[in-house]
């Protein structure tokens, strides 16, 4: 047991024990898919989940039963647990895809699971319509788990983490510039956020079921939408339903899912002024509206689609892009290059921090623009003191430095990912688009990946899986593990 001793002041034992708890939770999330497979008489698929549950429970029990003397967790343990959780969840979550009769190779299965958990929504399946109901549900469940965050769910259900260690985990996984506790206790904050998340899922599922979708498809698409994931039960995504009702309803809920859940909480309490006065929410609204209007104008001139259909499809696709949902209401391969460039910009920017979306986040964009404005002002008036304010709060120089570091890591990761894909034979533009799609957790395909990501070689799938992980955890929780300082005393 010496391997689990507190080596170099890093408490490995408590990390392993918590990983065991988390695997038991993951096994519980697999159970509905096994039940659905049984209900649809998909015996082979049902057994694939039973095998997966048994293996996951066994591994989880080993970790959970590990004796731990010291339950203290610091920042390093928080970062280590956060990163390991997403990787371990992906390794065990891929088991149903491997054991299924339509089994995927390991690189494809890991990619599919990482894509689901990070709510990227990119798929290696050539046809999802050939998959069992259990597998289709499991894909959407991975979105549901990852949308609000694996660690955040753990904070809501494991009382022992309602300490300083819980705050470390919260800060390691939650996205954005600052992390707001809307309740005094971190566990209550997690429970409140998950309550809002589940409520939005239920409302959307009911609305989709009231339309052309059956209950099963409504459940799958409801979870995928609020998580801004993008997995669908149809090969042609939402376009296959040919329903403006579905597109309009999902556009509204994708937009809502792109707003900070802390802000949604305040609005649910009747504080509508907080939404109106919020700088980030206003930028989000105007960027989305402006981009939708610009793309609609371009496609109206360049395509043969009637305006009546463009005003439904383009807002859907625009909100899908900026919220990193990755759903398709139209074939973007037919778009004008100007529209594609706007879509890439939206993918990179993302929506609001504290939501289920990917990308750089509008919060950082607001800070970058305001800081640039201040720098221009200082050139004219060197002695002027004009601090950067976002939502009425003065942001420190340290916060600005963190945003600059984030931009550098984002650009570096995009460059390395694009280079790696281009070396595997993909043309440069497709390599950049695909890397951007995975790094921003968008999942949208174009050109080589227009239909799916199946044709990318195994090496490329591992690269893209890593990009999805660092994009979801916003670099620091993963990159810090690669530094010598993290492992030293």
Regions found by a protein language model. Name each.
Residues 1-489:
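Membrane-proximal intracellular helices of multi-pass ion channels
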């Amino acid at each position: 047991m010496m391997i689990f001793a507190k080596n170099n002041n890093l408490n490995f034992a408590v990390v392993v024990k918590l990983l065991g708890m988390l695997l038991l939770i993951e096994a519980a999330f697999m159970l509905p898919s096994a039940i659905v497979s049984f209900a649809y008489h998909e015996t082979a698929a049902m057994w694939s989940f039973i095998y997966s549950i048994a293996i996951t429970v066994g591994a989880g029990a080993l970790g959970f039963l590990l004796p731990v003397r010291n339950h203290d967790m610091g920042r390093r343990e928080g970062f280590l647990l956060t990163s390991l959780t997403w990787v371990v969840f992906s390794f065990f979550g891929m088991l149903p895809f491997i054991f299924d009769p339509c089994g995927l190779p390991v690189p494809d299965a890991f990619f599919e699971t990482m894509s689901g958990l990070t709510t990227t929504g990119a798929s290696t399946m050539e046809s999802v319509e050939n998959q069992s109901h259990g597998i289709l549900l499991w894909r959407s469940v991975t979105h549901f788990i990852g949308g609000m965050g694996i660690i955040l769910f753990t904070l809501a259900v494991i009382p022992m983490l309602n300490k300083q260690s819980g705050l470390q985990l919260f800060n390691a996984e939650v996205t954005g510039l600052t992390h707001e506790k809307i309740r005094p206790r971190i566990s209550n904050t997690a429970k409140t956020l998950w309550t809002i998340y589940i409520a939005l899922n239920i409302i959307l599922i009911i609305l989709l079921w009231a339309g052309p979708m059956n209950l099963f498809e409504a459940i799958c698409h409801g979870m995928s939408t609020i998580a801004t994931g993008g997995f669908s039960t149809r090969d042609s995504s939402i376009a296959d339903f040919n329903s403006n009702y579905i597109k309009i309803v999902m556009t509204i809920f994708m937009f809502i899912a792109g707003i900070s859940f802390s802000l949604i909480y305040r609005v649910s309490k009747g504080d509508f002024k907080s939404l109106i006065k919020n700088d980030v929410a206003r930028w989000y609204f105007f960027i989305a509206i402006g981009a939708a209007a610009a793309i609609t104008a371009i496609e109206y001139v360049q395509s043969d689609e009637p305006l009546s259909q463009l005003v439904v499809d383009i807002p859907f696709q625009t909100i899908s892009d900026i919220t990193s949902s990755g759903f398709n209401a139209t074939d973007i391969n037919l778009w004008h290059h100007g529209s594609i460039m706007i879509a890439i910009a939206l993918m990179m920017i993302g929506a609001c921090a504290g939501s289920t979306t990917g990308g750089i986040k509008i919060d950082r964009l607001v800070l970058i623009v305001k800081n640039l404005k201040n720098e221009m002002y200082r050139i004219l008036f060197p002695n002027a003191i004009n601090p950067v304010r976002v939502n009425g709060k003065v942001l420190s120089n340290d916060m600005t430095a963190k945003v600059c570091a984030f931009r550098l890591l984002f650009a570096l990761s995009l460059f390395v990912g694009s280079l790696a894909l281009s070396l595997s034979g993909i043309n440069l533009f497709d390599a950049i688009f695909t890397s951007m799609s995975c790094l921003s957790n968008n999942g949208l395909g174009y050109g080589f990946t227009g239909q799916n990501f199946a044709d990318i070689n195994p090496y490329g799938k591992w690269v893209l899986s890593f990009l999805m992980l660092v994009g979801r955890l916003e670099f620091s929780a993963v990159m810090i593990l690669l530094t010598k300082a993290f492992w030293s005393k």
